[in-house]
Amino acid sequence: VKKILAVADTGKKNAALAEISRALIENSDKIIEANQKDLAAARENGMSVSMQDRLMLNEDRIKGIASAVDELIKLEDPIGKVDNGSVRPNGMRITKIRVPMGVIGMIYESRPNVTADAATLCLKTGNAVILRGGKEAYNSNKCICEIMRDAVEKAGFPKDIIQFVDDTTREVTTELMKCDKYLDLLIPRGGAGLIKAVTKNA
């Protein structure tokens, strides 16, 4: 799967991103419905108003997420770009060329917009992604991920270039941190506690 994405040209990747943007807007009602489940659970569990605001998605915020994807399409494709080069004394020229990492794992907390941000950034750079969001945004994250998986398939990519960890337990998260055989890079996005846990277990 990662090889298919790694060799995909800019046009195909941008077409998939455009499909994701369109699908997010088209399915905004579905996303909001899933998000309402997360908000109801958050209120029940006594989540602070400020944290609930981070968690909340409405039509305008979904439009903002889709707009960010549209902006990503406009950016230059970094893959294949030559950063610099040098000529060795024997005449051999050595250059640094940007290539995809492979499979990137993302562990993040309660902001559901990160699900779309992470997946689309990975797609633009030719990387497959495994997403593990916070349990507070489980329904929102899962819904957004399913929409994106369908969108990339419609654009001609395998669904599995975007994967979602369905289990939000700490044990599974810790296991993901240790998957160095399958992950080429692990990125934590969150508070000090998350960063510390990743540093300890990765």
What is the meaning of each model-derived region?
Residues 74, 83-202:
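Rossmann-like NAD(P) dinucleotide-binding subdomain of oxidoreductase/dehydrogenase enzymes
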Residues 1-94:
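N-terminal Rossmann-like NAD(P)+-binding subdomain of aldehyde/semialdehyde dehydrogenases
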